[in-house]
Amino acid sequence: ALNRSSGQWIQTKNNNSKLLVDKRNIEILGVIGDVTQWTPINKTRLWVYHLHYFDYVSGDIQSNDSATIKSIIDHWIEKNKMGKRPGWEPYPLSLRVVNWIKFALNGQSISGDVLDSLSLQAWYLSRNLEYHLYANHLFRNAMAFCFAGLFWDTKYSEKWLRKGTSIITKEL
């Protein structure tokens, strides 16, 4: 179940958001590429990671087509099965979970498949935390847990929120 009693979400503008050029192309780090090619061989690893972050869905999307964004999210779910890299690496997964939740909280309806994927990604993250990297990676893992923990109202979400706040408290 979704947690709808946690207060009002204040929409934020992501000044670093990527530019969705059209229904298939996105500009990331000054380079345009096909948004449906999740592991392009002609792009840098950093570019590919940014593609999987989904930063462009969490900011001001008034100029973007939300139906296109939803289609891209659905395509990601279809093409990136659990554990498939680079999308399921903990750092890009953490950023994506937060961005998809922000997308939903910014007034966009999301499908049951997207909710299922978000839950699965949070569960997967709980088994693949980046303790070995610490710093920004572990912090982003913790933030994803906090967002997931507050977004849902389940026994798992309570654990995610506790885990996220515990990591943040310990690391700060």
Task: Go through each PLM region and give its residues.
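Extreme N-terminal leader/anchor segments
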Residues: 1-36
